[in-house]
């Protein structure tokens, strides 16, 4: 019954299965392999931080809000509905590095307040300005990587890109 081991041997992103509907970003966290991922989380191996960058973006949560699940009014992460179908185009190494670097800036902004939990970091009424700035920079990189021709200012613009990318990927 408990014979299946899924703990990765590298750093991984712990992805909470549920986040509050008030969240502007998915509250994921990078953990070392020595930290056991509990059953209230999903995980994706992420030795370089690229996956963290994507899941921490407005592009991801826009897709999650639209095609992901819910429990009551909160968002429910699904690897099959939202993660495995997230339509990321082929990325060159320079683009990947920019997303990784921008994701690291999000982590750096969180580290400025080590006493705060993830819930406290992302309280919409108390999110630190430096964390907002870091997420804005990450959004610019992810949006550009996903094909945005200009700065995106709405969820609708992000959804248009997501659905266009998805349609392109399923056509082959």
Where are the regions a protein language model picked out?
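Non-catalytic DNA-recognition/assembly elements of restriction-modification systems
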Residues: 85-172
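Polybasic, glycine- and aromatic-enriched phosphate-binding surface used to engage nucleic acids
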Residues: 1-101, 105, 167-172
